[in-house]
Amino acid sequence: LDCTVIDGNLKQIDAGSGSVVGVNNLNETFVLIDNVFTKISGSLKHFSVGPAGQLGVNTANNIFKYQSGGFVQLAGLLKQVDAGGDQIIAGVNMYDDIYCLNMDANNKWPSSNTPWVQINGKLKYYSCGPYSCWGVNSNDQIFIMKDVSSNVCSGSGSFINIPGLLSMIEVATDGSVFGVNSQGNLYQRTGVTRSKPDGTDWISMVACPNGHKHVSFDLGVLWLVCVDGSIRKCILTD
């Protein structure tokens, strides 16, 4: 990995659709503007950006979508939300229940109802890409949901366990999958394609000298939050 340090300190980062966002330990929200993490108004504990828009949740688990210059609340409660799917929203609540919102409902919003779809299972973290969603449960076991589309955000409806243990996982808009385990090690899933969305193996890589906390990938750039909160921007090298 070819990495550079970006000024700032974050606990969570997300890159998608050409944007990069994050939050710090004070739940202040940041957007990358001209390679500088710039504070914007609003308090969030998790912030996600992607084809579904800019979405976040606060410490009370309220859900917000950034719309015309400010955050507007969506109906429902989630502790973590993801905007990386094909205009679908996905996330998990405080009980590790899993929900998603189809493209039509997301794009029609704000409307009188927000028809969240519950997905069978329990996950503490859930992230979607163009054709699959990946998640981890409270035991750090890894699961994939296949056949996810903009109109069927729940996919096939049944999770498949993938060998390995991760504490967080992110699927990029191009389908790439990266994750971090509880020891702070960084992994990429190899062999991921539309026809084989679960890929083949985990390979480890190092971007942070003292361990990794959070990872996201977009447009060929890997964005890392290290254990100490410092930020790395890395280019994948063969």
Curated annotation (Swiss-Prot):
Disulfide bond positions: C3-C234, C100-C153, C128-C133, C208-C226
Gene Ontology annotations for the cellular component aspect, listed alphabetically: extracellular region
Sequence repeat intervals: 1-34, 35-68, 69-106, 107-156, 157-199
Compartmental location: Secreted
Tissue spec. comment: Expressed in the eggs.
Keywords, ordered alphabetically: Disulfide bond, Glycoprotein, Lectin, Repeat, Secreted
GO terms of molecular function: carbohydrate binding
Pfam family, one: Tectonin
Glycan-bearing residues: N27
Annotated region (5 X approximate tandem repeats), positions in chain: 1-199
Repeat recorded as keyword: yes
Biological role: Lipopolysaccharide-binding protein with a very low agglutinating activity for human A-type erythrocytes and interacts with both Gram-positive and Gram-negative bacteria.
Sequence similarity: Belongs to the tectonin family.
The protein's name in its UniProt record: Fish-egg lectin
UniProt source species: Cyprinus carpio
